[in-house]
Amino acid sequence: MNKISRKGFLKIAAAAAMSGVTAGALAACNAASSSTAASAGAAGSYTPGTYTGTAEGISSTVKVTMTFSDSAVTDVVVDTSGETASYGAAAAEELKNQLLNAGSDEIDGVSGSTITSDAVKKAAKSCFAQAKGEATVTSVQLPTGDETDWLGKEPDIDEAAITETVDTDILIVGAGNGGMFAAAYAAAKGLNFRVIEQNGNVQDTRHWVGAVDGFGAQEQGIKMDRAKLLSEVSRYASGKCDQRVVKTWINESAEMIEFVRSIMEDKYGVKMIYTYGDEAKWPAENAEHNTDYMYPEIEYTYDRSSGAARNELLLQYIQELGYDVDFKTSLAKLEKNSDGRITGIIAQSTEDDHFIRYNANKGVLLACGGFPGNPYMMEQLDPLGTSVTTACSYSPSDKGYGIRAAMWAGANLDKEAAPMLFDRGIVAPGVDGGYVDSDTAFGGKAFPGTIRQYNPGTQPFLKVNRNGERFANESSPYNDIVYAAAHQPGRVYAQICDANILEDAKRFHTIGCSAQTRNGGEKYIQGKMDEAIEAGALFKCDTLDALADKMGFTGAAKDTFLATVERYNELYDKQNDEDFGKPAYRLSAIRTAPFYGCWLGASLLTTEQGIAINEKGQALDNDNKPMPGLYITGDMSGSFFANNYPCLMAGVAMGRTLTFAMKAVKQMAGLE
């Protein structure tokens, strides 16, 4: 293992690393963040020529190419094409103009594209340094893993490289959903804590939270059958869970959601919304013909019409109580003493790359997210889920660094994949499931879809393979049809419906976030369809024959497709799915023009395969013994899900995340 010295840590050989990612990419928890060496000044003497710098953006390697005369910048090309289309990718022209006008890397950036802007600044800084003849740094990343070894090796950092020390009682790593909720609870209790986050802002809020017998249920007189719920969670996981961990969520989530309410409603006036009754369940008719499911009334969200986001309000909450987040500070490694207790971490500034020791007297909580943005981990830990995925709706910064850091310290990773796959990965005809090569994406691979989620894809319309054949009962939880497609050509499938799409969706009555298709009305569904049509992924035709052509069906496959639609109409007329047993209320006619068709695979939201924990939220080692001083929550925690995500329990993952965030703080602070 190579030691990283203060002067030499940036000069690690790049052969095993990904090009375009810098040593500053020891993400606070799992994202890559880039860095260059010397700071470049505004004015000065340059060596005429063209220079290129790269840095990691939110989801890709950003490239800046600058041309210099002996005294000025004469041309700038900014390539952010791999960033989020409507944000970072769209900001390239404005960032280019800012660099030209400033004549330096000291620019304002573009609002809403902070991470991309920061990457452009760092890449530009490298160009200026090269033009001035100053030392520049080869872009490398400390341990990335690779295509055969996703884990890699823990960095060995010289004491001399650590130039700052911070002492605290509780350290929270990651300012996402779990980390910010833990911080809010700790702030409310007046505890001594710090939060670090590798990005420059809090991370995206997942708005739907699952809580058992919370205030909404109490107001409606609803009482959960907790034993049945425990059994159902275990059934989803095929028994590959720790039921004591599940019970912590079941028994303590009511207190969690009450604390959420106290901040959202009482403090900031944002109304909480509880979903219950028929709205929370599939129609009873489903059980007459199909395997039935449990539909626990656990879902809470809040009024977002004002633009409120929970994580941003939690940041405001802790700031008002005198706390804050150490942004642009990333996890490098955990530290432990001779007794094996986790005593803190070594972190790294993503601004100037100096190392910081955080001593945590009472414990460390890792709340770092999963690994959906890391193709090395996805392909090696979940080859099946990867193979059926066509689009992504995850946070690109979730690259599994927190999981890897915990494992380097001796923690035990769940052995079963548990991806959160939604059947909404819309793509153009001819596109297969799985990664495609990408010069700008982390690891050189990306999923091909350009739309994060096509929500109508969850509706149980007719679905066929590339041969035009129906192959499954389409009335199922979100991930069932995408796994069924793993056995079909290209691992994708086509969805077909007619002009009555909204009327059919209302009758289908799907639940959870897929209910947006029916509850959003014509304006919502038309917006989703227009977006997909513009992207060349959804087709609208006056005849089924024309639709078949647009969808790419030819020869025998086209004949089979048209025959399959005719057969499906017969089954609708009979109100009896003789072929696959779909409940009658979820059959639909395909007779009224215009007709719509698209190709779908999975949209990957996150991964739930994480570090094994006990009912207190403590990380477990490879002997399943608690690791003193280390707690885990969120998507990087395990012991709860396996194989899939129970999407008919809306909000269960976020409920688990917030419950164990609160639990960990209680444990570390000695509050229970």
Which role does the model predict for each range below?
Residues 170-194:
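N-terminal Rossmann-like FAD-binding beta1-loop-alpha1 element of flavoenzymes
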Residues 41-143:
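Active-site- and interface-proximal helix/loop "cap" or "latch" segments in soluble metabolic
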Residues 188-206:
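Glycine-rich FAD pyrophosphate-binding loop
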Residues 206, 251-354, 375-376, 435-437, ...:
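Conserved redox-cofactor binding core of oxidoreductases
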